[in-house]
Amino acid sequence: MIVFNENGITHLDLHGVRHSDVSEEVIDFIFQYQKLIPLIIICG
């Protein structure tokens, strides 16, 4: 999991994260960075 900022928007890159761990990672990311909305989550 990589968190980075691009053009003023915080991104979460989930490449390489196991499917079983994604839900927990996304919830933690949103709670931690909710004041910086909009957020982008990259999966694929």
Q: Each PLM stretch: what is its role?
A:
Residues 1-44:
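Long, charged, low-complexity intrinsically disordered regions
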